[in-house]
Amino acid sequence: MRKLALSDEILLTVEKPARYIGNEVNSVMKDKKDVEVRFAMCFPDVYEIGMSHLGIQILYDMFNKREDVWCERVYSPWTDLDKIMREKNIPLFALESQDPIKDFDFLGITIQYEMCYTNILQVLELSQIPLMTEERAKEHPFVIGGGPCTYNPEPLADFFDLFYMGEGETVYGQLLDTYKEWKASGADREAFLRMASHIPGIYVPSLYEVSYKEDGTILEMKPKYEDVPAKVDKQIVMEMAEAPYPEKPVVPFIKATQDRVVLEIMRGCIRGCRFCQAGMLYRPTRQKDVQVLKDYAYKMLKNTGHEEISLSSLSSSDYKDLEELVTFLIDEFKGKGINISLPSLRIDAFSLDVMSKVQDIRKSSLTFAPEAGSQRMRNVINKGLTEDDILRGAGLAFEGGWNKVKLYFMLGLPTETEEDMKGIAHLAEKIAKRYYEIPKDQRNGKCQITISTSFFVPKPFTPFQWAPMSTMDEFLGKARVVNTEVKEQLNRKSLKYNWHQADVTILEGLLARGDRKVAKSILAAYRKGCIYDAWGEQFHYDRWLEAFEETGLDLDRKSVV
């Protein structure tokens, strides 16, 4: 009989106790005596966020198809349970078996965004695993990281035994087999890390030495041993038809951020926007066969009971069989009470026709992502979108009955001028003007245009990776320019302007491009109580400033690398 790690008393005390009990529909139960490798798969955020992540579902399904492996899930406990676990010395546990993570062979952590870095330390500490790799002994699990942030893993190098670069479907089979071989040999912990470093795509930070220039930037990074590769190449799945995909994804007990069947239609993007890390990392573009996707749609809906299905990719409009797939989903499932959720599509006649069939026009809004206010700036970032394209798409939408538009822009892009910033308000005004050119009796009420600006963060492996980042004052000054210009527009009552937190952006930029010296600052911030930094109400910028000051890092340095 499976026993819960938390008592009824604790479960009735914390918010959303279903986060911690496991045993959901399609979760995999095995006898731990029948497997050779136990793997805890972690998303370092709250359950509802982690359960929405497709990558975890793919790897969970792939691992558990092996008879010799049992993969279980673990998420960051919310702050209420975090406090109780520390007070009562309860080790963090896996959802399926409810066993402590410290008893597993591996703890795999997907690292999707920089603002979860302190949560990684929370997971390690609550699991009673030493935070620093150098302090771990043979009885501790190996801690492995994956995901987009591992393309610059250096800020986390002190906390992880190894990372995989690229798509996990290609790496883990060989890694698990290597682990079994090492375990049977009885060799020490470093022996496994040396063996793992020979696997394409595996990076073991402790096997590399880093030297620095006088100004603090990296001079050289080289392997400590001749058999350790000097360069680690990312690994990708080239044949999408052969890539594993979960026909029975785990169904959460409580509403997740994305509580639906997800069909991944393609990987990669053909666009090449110069600021976009995902577009660069996930090259080349690879598409899934439309018949395979139709088959997955049937099976996944049947196996989950979900009432919604959505498409996943970086650029869905570029999927060659999009029209056939969307038409099939509408014809097959719309009449059966299944909602069809479409990603952001290029706004053209086909897209609007499709959206009108699956959305309530009076309630839904259309999203445009011009990214920059002027054509000059859009050319600099290689957006491939003209003002005529935007106005034509908006006009088609307005004529089709829509009256709500969301516009997404970035501030602080390289070579940006004040005119580029003001162009954001001017473009929004032109879109509003286009709406009011429609005869009044054909309009759907008042036009509502929401302008949102994020602040540019130069990310590794993008053409802008070495670009300087604006300071806090500069970011806020740019937002004020846009805000003032919006208020001066003729149709200002139809325009609403929101901007992202500048302090979060500053921190994200340092963590994205930092080196191993940043690890001590992350640890210091964690010791000051920083966790859930991606959650606005939990973010404490003042504590981060204290941590950087105490560890000797200059957060305002424009060329942080």
Language-model features: where?
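Radical SAM enzyme core and accessory elements
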Residues: 1-29, 33, 39-41, 488-561
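A glycine-rich phosphate-binding loop feature that marks nucleotide/adenosyl-phosphate handling sites
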Residues: 195-204, 314-319, 343-349, 412, ...
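N-terminal [4Fe-4S]-dependent radical SAM core
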Residues: 10-40, 47-48, 205, 211-262
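Iron-sulfur (Fe-S) cluster-binding segments and ferredoxin-like electron-carrier domains
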Residues: 276-292
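N-terminal pre-triad scaffold of radical SAM enzymes
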Residues: 39-45, 63, 249-275, 301, ...
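Glycine-rich beta-alpha loop elements in corrinoid/cobalamin-binding modules
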Residues: 77-222, 460-515, 523-535
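Conserved SAM/AdoMet-binding glycine-rich loop
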Residues: 41-42, 46, 115, 298-450
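A short beta-strand-loop structural module common to alpha/beta enzyme folds
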Residues: 67-80
